[in-house]
Amino acid sequence: MDESSLLRRRGLQKELSLPRRGRGCRSGNRKSLVVGTPSPTLSRPLSPLSVPTAGSSPLDSPRNFSAASALNFPFARRADGRRWSLASLPSSGYGTNTPSSTLSSSSSSRERLHQLPFQPTPDELHFLSKHFRSSENVLDEEGGRSPRLRPRSRSLSPGRATGTFDNEIVMMNHVYRERFPKATAQMEGRLQEFLTAYAPGARLALADGVLGFIHHQIVELARDCLAKSGENLVTSRYFLEMQEKLERLLQDAHERSDSEEVSFIVQLVRKLLIIISRPARLLECLEFDPEEFYHLLEAAEGHAREGQGIKTDLPQYIIGQLGLAKDPLEEMVPLSHLEEEQPPAPESPESRALVGQSRRKPCESDFETIKLISNGAYGAVYLVRHRDTRQRFAIKKINKQNLILRNQIQQVFVERDILTFAENPFVVSMFCSFETRRHLCMVMEYVEGGDCATLLKNMGPLPVDMARLYFAETVLALEYLHNYGIVHRDLKPDNLLITSLGHIKLTDFGLSKIGLMSMATNLYEGHIEKDAREFIDKQVCGTPEYIAPEVIFRQGYGKPVDWWAMGVVLYEFLVGCVPFFGDTPEELFGQVVSDEIMWPEGDEALPADAQDLITRLLRQSPLDRLGTGGTHEVKQHPFFLALDWAGLLRHKAEFVPQLEAEDDTSYFDTRSERYRHLGSEDDETNDEESSTEIPQFSSCSHRFSKVYSSSEFLAVQPTPTFAERSFSEDREEGWERSEVDYGRRLSADIRLRSWTSSGSSCQSSSSQPERGPSPSLLNTISLDTMPKFAFSSEDEGVGPGPAGPKRPVFILGEPDPPPAATPVMPKPSSLSADTAALSHARLRSNSIGARHSTPRPLDAGRGRRLGGPRDPAPEKSRASSSGGSGGGSGGRVPKSASVSALSLIITADDGSGGPLMSPLSPRSLSSNPSSRDSSPSRDPSPVCGSLRPPIVIHSSGKKYGFSLRAIRVYMGDSDVYTVHHVVWSVEDGSPAQEAGLRAGDLITHINGESVLGLVHMDVVELLLKSGNKISLRTTALENTSIKVGPARKNVAKGRMARRSKRSRRRETQDRRKSLFKKISKQTSVLHTSRSFSSGLHHSLSSSESLPGSPTHSLSPSPTTPCRSPAPDVPADTTASPPSASPSSSSPASPAAAGHTRPSSLHGLAAKLGPPRPKTGRRKSTSSIPPSPLACPPISAPPPRSPSPLPGHPPAPARSPRLRRGQSADKLGTGERLDGEAGRRTRGPEAELVVMRRLHLSERRDSFKKQEAVQEVSFDEPQEEATGLPTSVPQIAVEGEEAVPVALGPTGRD
């Protein structure tokens, strides 16, 4: 090699080597790789070259450099010479115009390519090839290793490094802003104009809820991009994820909405993509990493050569694989042509009619109101039924004037958008919305089981497993919402609804905020603090006990406020009361921001993992709070160690609501005493104050469109689906048809509930077609027209009876009576052994799981008058908590095998007909399988078999001549039982014997009202009201599925399945009359000295004589009855029956008084004082309840009563957790008048916790939403004030010994 070549080579080595420590960066003249004139612009800045490491590999990149020197930019000085142009490179950044292809992708824009010679010699090419490809270091002329640290490009693209450092992002943005200042300023200016023009508050809201939510997200993405650009945090990876989010939102808009407003969303997405397109391309070029590219290129080359056998034209193949050979116009033209010029597909008249009807906006006339579910500050929630599909919904009516005067129109649109967009099994779904003259209405799915607040009110603290399940399902709902940027802001037990299967659904998004959806590129340093202060409000919003400290301080808040509320909710689940309370908002907020949490001790102490979870959720600082970093922090807590998060819906819940009928709303508290909203639309309204946004509120979600169109389609299609028609429809239409015409005249204007028939097995499941069911569910829906009375025959039951036909038998009118088999009426002394042992035997059902239908008894002469007026007695008739043939609108809604026990056996010759009750009522359209069950273990109606014609007994005024007795019927092998009544004896020659009453028969109806499951006093009350004529329906025990088993060894563990005693009112009845009825019935207390010409002597118990007792009044209770399973009580306890109303003043319901909810502004209420009289207030035009924060504090709060803990008897429980989970029913039956002997000594701390749990009055709702009304709860000392006897009611034939009634766990059982 000649001397000149050697000198040139050494000089090249010097130029390529990096400076040593302490030496400044050398920057020479930059020469262009593009042939052309010198550029007058600034030279491109170089990479920061800091912290050189001796002996490093040439393949290393300066990734891990010091943070202190991160911003030291050794820019090249301005110098003469040529520059290479970025515009000459493809967007991938690997193409150059150098003569040597070996250098084409070796260096990126970050390399010192300006120091390379323009025309290298072969020796130089050999050296450069070795230099860039070899892993060996090259000795420079000074003996050092060269290079020590190669100035590679720092790529921020995914997959290159394990993490991305903020200083790298900031450094890259400095380079980007320095090099392309106009691109950055142009993007930020356009983003600001975009936000100004398209923000939700700057234009009318979209009419479609899904599109409204997507609009919110697009605007939030643009706002986040503008903020990150100002903070120098944008990267090519961020733009890539932003593009993916926009495409995902656009896909949701096309799939989930049929509105014409989709074009607006498409236009919005295109504008935003155009705004960010140029910065995204520039950053992609700047962040190009040749090392990563070479690895990918080698892998692709090996795959191409080995796998596909490509030998020639490899560069062209790579270009094709990278998509660089495609013409973008070829893909854009067909799309535009498809959108603009594609002719509409031909449609048939039927399809056009379906589309027109499905797209028709819903209105109030499409629904018929069944009853009130609950009241709130802004409006009320009603149970309604769609007139065409016959499906049940819950409709939320919000007063428009309240919203306008409070300037919260935008907030109700946010609630509508969230409910419409959300698709999660743990979030309530909305189907449509519309406006009336006075209200904004949102139609949502009906969740039957009430809310967790009512459950806590009736049950007290929940068992740990039950609380864990509820909490975990709420965590999944919260995870879904937070991923879409939704902050609920009002999490509390009141907003956690319980489905018929015992699972949780989150509802009430009236205070929610929509923020930015989760993005992976937001995981940078400082993002947690920014997200924790995403929103700032000028006033405190939420429910006081659940408001986080940062909201109280008005420091800004975000998703961590929901985790604070979750900690309060879990504490309330396990302890029974909230951890913070006070008489005034100031006192309450003072405890929230300063007080420590008080924990129960002793037997009631919480598990260590649960206490740790609550403590970490209730951290004062939102940055330290569990869940702030993501939902995975909560899900990985040891409290959920053994929990299967993926199978929560398959988990069997401990509490499964027992519904009596499809319109049963007894699990909800109507709160009629606190709020009153007029349901009429005829009241005067101020139309001048109407908002221009309100007409946009009417919308129809894709769920409702699919259901409506499917009902229209299935109504005209022949289908073998087994269906029946509701009695309310019969009552409305009022037409008559013959049996022949009824099977032929099937028209599309009749929409019926769906059934799936397989022999006599009737199953149904979730009616949402887009959600996949579990293996045990049938995802079918049919709304075809079928006869009004349909029952399945017995072909798989356990009980006796001939096997019926496999096809359903439709019975219209009164069929022939069953074959006469007149039994011999035994004398009282000659009862069978089985009947005589009923009081001490355990009766159980072994037919759990069989699917049978419930007959509805028809009176004689009503056979063909299907649509005529109904009798008063069946109007009040109800199905029992364990089943039975119910009147009214049908039998009870079935429960799982663990809850319901008795199976109804319908023989082929049964002479009565009735509607079938489906496990999934198609009138209750659920968005997912968690709302209703369709497992084969669901019993449609579990009591008796064939019912005889009613036995009418006429008395001469002396007596009826028979006695009855209450028996326990246990449900399967469980400890849950229901009370049934049998005819114990019939006197010879008495009116009862002459009418055909037989001893040993099971009484199912008295005067047309079902008595299955009623306590004994209720049955006695029905008899005493009958006068000289009584109508009984009975059935033989051998015709039922009740089996006689061995006597129970421990009757104290029995749990009675209660049912509320209430009568049904007509839909057109004025609700105001119920109050006067209730007062009139309370004054007519039954007297113990009169027999009402029945000869049945009756002793009243304390709870029956109380005016507030539900056993006294037949009117429905305004509050939710206690429906939870009863706890364990001693066997020798003589007690009055528990009150079915938690708000009753009966001392038999300590849970009602003890486990009360915190009141709105007064944390502790007086327990013994009378309720405060409500002062009259002038009716305002807007009917707006005042904000609790605006109310002045009470000068003299009511005194706190001593702890009622000594009043609780020592009840044996299997564990401390179960002891806390005792319900009001069992606590009532276990109450003693001499409860002083059963007191337990406790420390002052434990008594304080118990006092806080037992003395909190009814809970409050949101500060903005609800007014403060104090409600007084009652305590045990009233028991002594009543002065009423607590003896067990007895019924006996005149002149004979009274027979004790099995009302509870007594010694006679």
UniProtKB/Swiss-Prot annotation:
GO terms for biological process: cytoskeleton organization; intracellular signal transduction. The modification Phosphoserine is found at residues 66, 85, 146, 680, 710, 728, 754, 774, 782, 792-793, 1223, 1273. Residues 1228-1245 have a biased composition (Basic and acidic residues). GO terms for molecular function: ATP binding; magnesium ion binding; protein serine kinase activity; protein serine/threonine kinase activity. Its cofactor is Mg(2+). The keyword Membrane does not apply. Residues 1185-1213 have a biased composition (Pro residues). Keywords: ATP-binding, Cytoplasm, Disease variant, Epilepsy, Intellectual disability, Kinase, Magnesium, Nucleotide-binding, Phosphoprotein, Serine/threonine-protein kinase, Transferase. It catalyses: L-seryl-[protein] + ATP = O-phospho-L-seryl-[protein] + ADP + H(+); L-threonyl-[protein] + ATP = O-phospho-L-threonyl-[protein] + ADP + H(+). Changing residue 101 to F: In DEE108; uncertain significance. GO terms for cellular component: cytoplasm. Gene3D superfamilies: 2.30.42.10, MAST3 pre-PK domain-like (1.20.1480.20), Phosphorylase Kinase, domain 1 (3.30.200.20), Transferase(Phosphotransferase) domain 1 (1.10.510.10). Its EC number is 2.7.11.1. It comes from the Eukaryota. Residues 950-1038 form the PDZ domain. Residues 37-53, 756-767, 915-942, 1088-1121, 1135-1153 have a biased composition (Low complexity). Residues 88-99 have a biased composition (Polar residues). Changing residue 551 to L: In DEE108; uncertain significance. PANTHER family: MICROTUBULE-ASSOCIATED SERINE_THREONINE-PROTEIN KINASE 3 (PTHR24356:SF140), SERINE/THREONINE-PROTEIN KINASE (PTHR24356). It is linked to Developmental and epileptic encephalopathy 108: A form of epileptic encephalopathy, a heterogeneous group of early-onset epilepsies characterized by refractory seizures, neurodevelopmental impairment, and poor prognosis. Development is normal prior to seizure onset, after which cognitive and motor delays become apparent. DEE108 is an autosomal dominant form characterized by the onset of multiple types of seizures in the first 2 years of life. This is Microtubule-associated serine/threonine-protein kinase 3. It comes from Homo sapiens.
